[in-house]
Amino acid sequence: MHVLHAVTSGWKQLGRNIRLFFLANMLYQIGTGMFSVLYNLYIQALGYEDTMNGTIVSVQSLATALVFIPIGLIADRASHKLLLSLGAMLTGLSFMGRAFASGESGLVLLAVAAGLFAAFFQVIAVPFLAENTDKQQRLKIFSYHFSLVLAAQVLGSSGGGVLADLLQQAGMEKIHSLQTVLFIGGAASLLAFIPLLFVQKTAKEKVLVETVVPEAATKPMVPAKDDWKAICKFTLAQLIVGTGSGLVVPYLNLYFTNRFAVSLSAVGILISLGQVMTIVSMLIGPTLANRVGPVKAVVLFQMMSLPFLLLTGFTNLFVIASITFLFRQALMNAANPIQSSIMVDRVSDARRGIANSMTQTAFMLGWATMGPVQSFLLTAYGTYWGYAITFSMTGVLYISASAMYYFMFKERKTAASKAAAAM
């Protein structure tokens, strides 16, 4: 009862717009979770080679990357409520169309459409949360946000995998069962626009009056040059991380089914468990950040994930692969809300939309470029060495990104500390 009361009390303390956004995002991410686990299995069930999955991931990621910056520029000037609502509706409709597409051209075109529309939520979520919270709450709210995203994806991925297996056991063909579940996922994402209709339009003006104006009266404006310097640093780090992720993350379900021949339910449950562990690590992330500093916390989480990443790539034992996958998933992703908080704190309000869009663009470009590389390595070296090589390449890229992140942002933090001490 005490835990339930604490959760209820914490929920009520959130602003109205934050609660509505969290509800909408939960529906949206349930649909995304279903697609993340089942869609490349659907492509495989249609009889396409693994290279087709690589193509789909690449074109979708590239489409998303291409519109990140335009949406970021629009988001700094337009209604976040309108853009989020459009994103939910169009993403849901594109998902529903993808559930029944089977021809190569249809698969590619709808992948492009889904990639374009998915950018709305990815770009606008962080600026929306930032404008509806004060600085002291941001790290906590970002942790809640990323944890809620993963919790909803747990429901989507685990529920989708189990439902697909149940439909097959009831006599439905594999392709039809996957189509049914994918359509349900699209409908869930579509319904996300309903809570967004009740978001108050005056939220942005309210925050500007209460927080930005007093700060402007007491602090000099951040020079645009400093903003763009910070944005470029964040973008470079995310490009390297995205390149590494693009070799492994989109194909984790295929990794388990190809190497260990496990069922759809097992894959869905395993990926869901990884997300549950990530939720826990994200919630304890702010505590670590308060103790060692946010930059060091990001680097520690990322570096601790590397041994588990390599063990996953090289093991032939399903039990070991499952355990190492869970720890890698939790540790690597635990840094995400901390990184968002660092970026929001180091970039002024006027450029947060473009900052988030540029870092997201860099990350998705990494995914887009690595799809064909992963497919080639898997085709050329088989399901053991192909995955071993891609996991190893990802490890090298993660080490590079972590080292770069530490030295770039450690210098800025040290300079700020010296300035504060001098005062």
Residue ranges and their predicted role:
Residues 67-79, 164, 281-293, 378-379:
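Helix-to-loop junctions at the C-terminal end of transmembrane segments
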Residues 165-187, 376-398:
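A membrane-interface helix-boundary motif in multi-pass transporters
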Residues 188-203, 306, 392-423:
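Multi-pass alpha-helical transporter architecture, strongest
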Residues 110-149:
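Cytoplasmic helix-loop-helix junction between adjacent transmembrane helices
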Residues 82-97, 296-311:
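Structural signature of the two symmetry-related core transmembrane helices
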Residues 26, 94, 105-121, 239, ...:
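Hydrophobic core of transmembrane alpha-helices in multi-pass small-molecule transporters
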Residues 1-15, 201-237, 422-423:
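Juxtamembrane intracellular "pre-TM" segments in multi-pass secondary transporters
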Residues 3-66, 230-271:
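Helix-loop boundary and gating motifs at the non-cytosolic
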